[in-house]
């Protein structure tokens, strides 16, 4: 059987002040050239992501306010213009509407949700059925800080995250007013 191979392209993005963010990856121009080589080698998909070999998770997965929404998208757009394989983007794409706009604009082929899925693992189903989606705050409390401190992952907005096997939260019966 064939196996799809995705390459996560580590790019050193820029902070809002123009300084490099993280270490150990490719500059955007290098990433674009490397993406063409990857396609030529037969890769099936490329995910443009932040590079980080600093040991600081905040460099890779910035907390709210540290980076703009969709912050890896400019490099993903450049890569997509150069290759014919699908290109994914990741990085503070916090709503389904934002992801749909990126896809509609042709800026990327796939949205790689990360923290959003920890916050609401049913995001795709809810988007399809019109149910309200719990949107990630990008607070990094329970997810990124837990990884950094080698603890189990949780989410401040999703009480079940990390305890799915032991907690079964069920909807209450009838309408209730809760203060």
Role assignments for model-derived ranges:
Residues 1-179:
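Flavin-dependent oxidoreductase catalytic cores
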């Amino acid at each position: 059987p064939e196996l799809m191979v995705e390459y996560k392209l580590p790019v050193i993005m820029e902070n809002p002040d123009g300084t490099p963010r993280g270490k150990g990856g490719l500059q955007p121009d290098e990433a674009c050239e490397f993406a063409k080589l990857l396609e030529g080698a037969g890769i099936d998909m490329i995910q443009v992501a932040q590079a980080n070999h600093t040991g600081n998770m905040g460099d890779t997965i910035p907390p709210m306010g540290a980076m703009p929404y969709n912050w890896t998208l400019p490099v993903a757009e450049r890569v997509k213009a150069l290759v014919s394989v699908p290109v994914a983007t990741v990085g503070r794409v916090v709503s389904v509407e934002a992801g749909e706009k990126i896809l509609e604009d042709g800026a990327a082929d796939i949205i790689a949700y990360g923290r959003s899925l920890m916050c609401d693992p049913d995001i795709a189903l809810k988007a399809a059925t019109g149910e309200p989606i719990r949107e990630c705050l990008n607070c990094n409390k329970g997810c990124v800080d837990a990884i950094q401190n080698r603890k189990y992952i949780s989410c401040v907005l999703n009480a079940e995250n990390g305890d799915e096997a032991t907690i079964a939260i069920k909807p209450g019966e009838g309408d209730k007013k809760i203060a």
